[in-house]
Amino acid sequence: KVHFPISRIDVMDGSRRSSKSNAYFSGLGKNKRIALFDTLIEKHSVDELLSIIAHEVGHYKKRHNIKGIVLGVVQTGIMFFLLSIFLNNTGLFAAFKMENLSIYASLLFFSVLYSPIELIMSFVGNAISRKHEFEADAFAKKSIETGEHLINGLKNLTVTNLGNLTPHPLTVWMSYSHPPVLDRIHALFD
């Protein structure tokens, strides 16, 4: 129904390492695949699993993997550009009253001064990731023609993974790559 060319759906033996459940989409070109943890399959109904798979297909259809790669390349490019500015920068050494240039000192300066930039980029990356999750949820709802099964699946995932239903908004903004489940459920009701 959603025209998703996939070579296989893998079942990951996650129960050996954890009781948590998960599913993910990965791959490019002809090597696309969806992986479902065995714990996910054990604890969810067929309808919930179909909606979770539709959510993962949504990531593909909305090109979230490509956008993630582009974002990663841009972030890495920014890091290397800034690193090139810091390496053996005579003005930086003069500001710290250092007479001799040192690659080690340059790397130390860079790591200290780059940290706030990296923090800001992580906030941006998390915000984009949360937006992608809402988009994949909406795709699943449209594909399955109901959000009910995905809502039930999200509830089960939260119970299984001991998720926090009401995290502080600042915590979400700073560190969550996925929106809180209650926000996702509210969005699916709209």
Spans of features found by a protein language model:
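Alpha-helical transmembrane segments
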Residues: 109-112
